[in-house]
């Protein structure tokens, strides 16, 4: 029997038919998506493991319908950081579904501080001391966003299913990913990542960066 592990995921959007289109998910039917995502979780996460879901577990479902899907996930200890589409999971009839966490959850494990939230942050607690930021919400597709973070020394990761082959990501995988990455001591706002892809914003940030460099040369 292996040692219990910690896993992260986000934005499963169980029950949300429109997510098949706007996130280009590879299923034609919402029930197929629901059960495939549950199978993927159960294939990775053992009942004794811990799973952090960083928001948007379901959408367009009643809390009871979402609860029935939750019961199909074998993991006993699932933490939920609420997203913008989540139900009130503190209701007595479903209170055993999740360990409901605050909007920003900080975990210290394996010598690392992990700052978790549904929404991504440009700057987070202890960023300059090597802390990680794990989030969801943005539905980045494929590895491009997470790879761009890594290339800039940002220990920030979108745990959403759309960015991770529709599977959870383990703490061990993130250790491997971030091992040896030189992070910035602090981030000045002109150097923040342009996550919009807007050419005008790129030009604006480039201009501000030149201003900062000019001031530092004086």
PLM feature segments, named:
Residues 1-4:
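Short, Lys/Arg-enriched N-terminal segments with co-localized hydrophobic residues
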Residues 7-9, 14-106:
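Core catalytic region of metal-dependent phosphoesterases/phosphodiesterases
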Residues 9-12, 62, 176, 196, ...:
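Residue-identity detector for threonine
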Residues 16-21, 190-200, 212-218:
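N-terminal pre-catalytic "stem/leader" segment of glycosyltransferase-like enzymes
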Residues 95-197, 202:
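Conserved beta-sheet core of the metallophosphoesterase superfamily
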């Amino acid at each position: 029997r292996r040692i219990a592990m910690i896993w992260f995921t986000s934005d499963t959007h169980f029950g949300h038919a429109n997510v098949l289109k706007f996130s280009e998910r590879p299923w034609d039917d919402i029930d197929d998506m629901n059960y495939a995502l549950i199978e993927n979780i159960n294939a990775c996460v053992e009942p004794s493991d811990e799973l952090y879901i960083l928001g948007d577990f379901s959408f367009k479902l009643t809390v009871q319908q979402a609860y029935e899907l939750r019961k199909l996930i074998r993991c006993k200890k699932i933490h939920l950081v609420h997203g913008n589409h989540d139900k009130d999971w503190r209701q007595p009839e479903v209170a055993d579904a999740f360990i409901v966490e605050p909007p920003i959850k900080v975990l210290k494990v394996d010598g690392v501080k992990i700052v978790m939230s549904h929404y991504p942050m440009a700057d987070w607690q202890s960023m300059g001391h090597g802390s990680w930021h794990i989030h969801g919400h943005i539905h980045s597709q494929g590895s491009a966003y997470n790879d761009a973070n890594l290339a800039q020394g940002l220990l920030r990761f979108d745990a959403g299913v759309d960015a991770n082959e529709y599977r959870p990501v383990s703490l061990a995988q993130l250790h491997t990913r971030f091992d040896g990455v030189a992070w910035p001591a602090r981030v000045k706002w002109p150097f923040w990542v342009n996550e919009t892809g807007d050419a005008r914003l790129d030009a604006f940030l480039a201009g501000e960066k030149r201003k900062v460099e000019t001031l530092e040369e004086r």
